[in-house]
Amino acid sequence: MPNISLSSRCNLHCPYCFAHETMGAGSGDITLENFDAALEFLTRTGPVNIGLIGGEPTLHPHFDEIVRRAVACENVAMLTVYTNGLLIEKHADVLSLPKVTLLVNWNAPNELRGGAFEQIKRGVDELVFNRDMGRRINLGLNLHGESMEYGYMLDLLKRYGFDKVRISLTVPEFPEGCGQNAIERFRACKPFLLKMFADMDAIGVLPYYDCNRPPWCIWSDEEKQWLRDLAARHGADECTLVDTESFCRPVIDVLPDLRAVRCFGMSAFEKVDIRDYANVNELVAHFMRRIDRPAYRIKAMPECENCHLRRTWLCCQGCMGYKMVEIEKMNAERGE
């Protein structure tokens, strides 16, 4: 799903954020003219789901107008607002419009200050209990180490009666984090993930992965069967927890100045002007050639050498940002 970044500003400083490269830089807030141009570009080939991101998108001074414009666009099938939740009560009227869904990345109480946790709760309460938006809100949990406190999230999921939660295994800022090995990190997180999944299953919640999904090969046969059984209990035999394929394709994030990146994880690699491309498909093809093609040729571990999934672009072995330096070298060798 392509995204439009409304602002490079944010009212939090999350330890796991990989968007610092664009935060507080560039042109700040997107102009309404540029928003209209970005929306037209992304929907030029037909109906599509669009995300509003940041920074924190709700900080934009014309956020309500932007949401209304996007909802009114007949080629916007669904509009997802990615938010930390601090200002959703203020914008409840537009956030409850048709087509709008929310992904609330809700940090732990010890990571929030000055009543921020309760402020987020008031906003979600308003949308769920007074605006009947329970089926249009997802909560997000961001794992930025090998473990974390997640009891608060279990309480929130029970409070709102939610039956799913997004799990994001965050990545370091690139290119500084390129020396790390994604597979080793996934393996280190396994005990924690299995315990957390079991605790979520116990309250009727099915977790699902964001990008940077662990490859299926990190699990033992016993663990694979346990995950299959968990998914089956929720009637979700094809959910991300048991998907044998672990890959991503260019997302396309349009920045306030109308430059685009493949995704925030690769934002330091290359930014291109959307006005130089006929449509979003042409832009995707550009990033596939410049980033994805070399990325799938790079082996994260020796055992990846003969992996059929890697060879057929169905396992990217974690976020491509880990391979950024190697991708640049391969492109240079090809004269790009």
Language model features: what each stretch is:
Residues 1-33:
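Canonical Radical SAM [4Fe-4S] cluster-binding loop centered on the CxxxCxxC motif
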Residues 1-3, 44, 285, 289-290:
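N-terminal [4Fe-4S]-dependent radical SAM core
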Residues 10, 14-17, 217, 239, ...:
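Disulfide-bonded cysteines in secreted/extracellular proteins and peptides
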